[in-house]
Amino acid sequence: MSEFSNVTVIKKANIYFEGKVASHTVLFPDGTKKTLGIMQAGDYEFSTANAEVMEILSGTLEWQMKGECCWKTIGAGESFQIPADSVFLMKVPAVADYCCSYIQ
């Protein structure tokens, strides 16, 4: 899906890591939530409250669950799922565009 219809977009950006990661929240009529964002090059650690699906729209990155030994590479058009109440790491070599879906 390349666009969303009939949604509410929160104007104020979610800013993380001194501005290197920024996203906007998109709310759907059924109560679901997504964020659309950009990550600049860097190494990041994120924690989750709910399960999430990270879809990479452009760029590539490596990711792993905290404590795992192996990094996984993912690129544009691919996605990965993160369990609720967990921590994951990302290595982003160049700007990456993403859509994060929050699973209730």
Swiss-Prot record:
What are the annotated disulfide bridges?
none
By its UniProt entry, which CDD domains does this protein fall under?
cupin_PpnP-like
* Any GO CC annotation of this UniProt entry: cytosol
Q: What does this protein do?
A: Catalyzes the phosphorolysis of diverse nucleosides, yielding D-ribose 1-phosphate and the respective free bases. Can use uridine, adenosine, guanosine, cytidine, thymidine, inosine and xanthosine as substrates. Also catalyzes the reverse reactions.
Top enzyme class, one word, equals transferase
What gene is this protein translated from? ppnP
Q: Where are the transmembrane segments?
A: none
- The name on file for this protein is Pyrimidine/purine nucleoside phosphorylase
Gene3D superfamilies (alphabetical): Jelly Rolls
Note the HAMAP family from the entry.
Nucleos_phosphorylase_PpnP
Which GO molecular function annotations are given, in alphabetical order? guanosine phosphorylase activity; purine-nucleoside phosphorylase activity; thymidine phosphorylase activity; uridine phosphorylase activity
Q: Which branch of life, at top level? A: Bacteria
Q: Does the keyword Transferase apply?
A: yes
Among SUPFAM superfamilies, the record links this protein to:
RmlC-like cupins (SSF51182)
InterPro entries tied to this protein: Ppnp, RmlC-like_jellyroll, RmlC_Cupin_sf
**According to the UniProt entry, what is the EC number of this protein?**
2.4.2.1, 2.4.2.2
- The species this protein belongs to is Pelobacter propionicus (strain DSM 2379 / NBRC 103807 / OttBd1)
Q: Which family does it belong to?
A: Belongs to the nucleoside phosphorylase PpnP family.
Q: Give the matching Pfam families.
A: Ppnp
Do you know which PANTHER family this protein is assigned to? PYRIMIDINE/PURINE NUCLEOSIDE PHOSPHORYLASE, PYRIMIDINE_PURINE NUCLEOSIDE PHOSPHORYLASE
Name the reaction it catalyses.
a purine D-ribonucleoside + phosphate = a purine nucleobase + alpha-D-ribose 1-phosphate; adenosine + phosphate = alpha-D-ribose 1-phosphate + adenine; cytidine + phosphate = cytosine + alpha-D-ribose 1-phosphate; guanosine + phosphate = alpha-D-ribose 1-phosphate + guanine
Q: Keywords for this entry? A: Glycosyltransferase, Transferase
